[in-house]
Curated annotation (Swiss-Prot):
Record: residues binding Ca(2+) 2: D62, D64, D66, E68, E73
Name of protein: Protein S100-B
Gene: S100b
UniProt main location, coarse: cytoplasm
Residue intervals of the EF-hand domain: 13-48, 49-84
Oligomer status and interactors: Dimer of either two alpha chains, or two beta chains, or one alpha and one beta chain. The S100B dimer binds two molecules of STK38. Interacts with CACYBP in a calcium-dependent manner. Interacts with ATAD3A; this interaction probably occurs in the cytosol prior to ATAD3A mitochondrial targeting. Interacts with S100A6. The S100B dimer interacts with two molecules of CAPZA1. Interacts with AGER. Interacts with PPP5C (via TPR repeats); the interaction is calcium-dependent and modulates PPP5C activity. Interacts with TPPP; this interaction inhibits TPPP dimerization.
SUPFAM superfamilies attached to this UniProt entry: EF-hand
Induction: Up-regulated in periinfarct ventricular myocardium.
Alphabetic keyword roster: Acetylation, Calcium, Cell adhesion, Cytoplasm, Metal-binding, Nucleus, Repeat, Secreted, Zinc
Length: 92
């Protein structure tokens, strides 16, 4: 398996490690998203302690307005964070 394919499998695995703990196994609730960000993105994003921050992140991601983050919305978030990190490291 190529490095890119391994990365894709890892993204899918991480999403499903957190989704469905509290409901729909194909979506992240706010608490699941917060835990995922704090555990899996701690080197790129500061730990989220304030509920208002989680609410704002979810509001931005939740394109269909169902109050949860599906895989497509999660991938849009990962893409935004990855792009921001790429731009940061490119200028170092």
């Amino acid at each position: 398996m190529s490095e890119l394919e391994k990365a894709m499998v890892a993204l899918i695995d991480v999403f499903h490690q957190y989704s469905g703990r509290e409901g729909d196994k194909h979506k992240l609730k706010k608490s699941e998203l917060k835990e995922l960000i704090n555990n899996e993105l701690s080197h790129f994003l500061e730990e989220i302690k304030e509920q208002e921050v989680v609410d704002k992140v979810m509001e931005t991601l939740d394109e269909d307005g169902d109050g949860e983050c599906d895989f497509q919305e999660f991938m849009a978030f990962v893409s935004m964070v990855t792009t921001a990190c790429h731009e940061f490291f490119e200028h170092e």
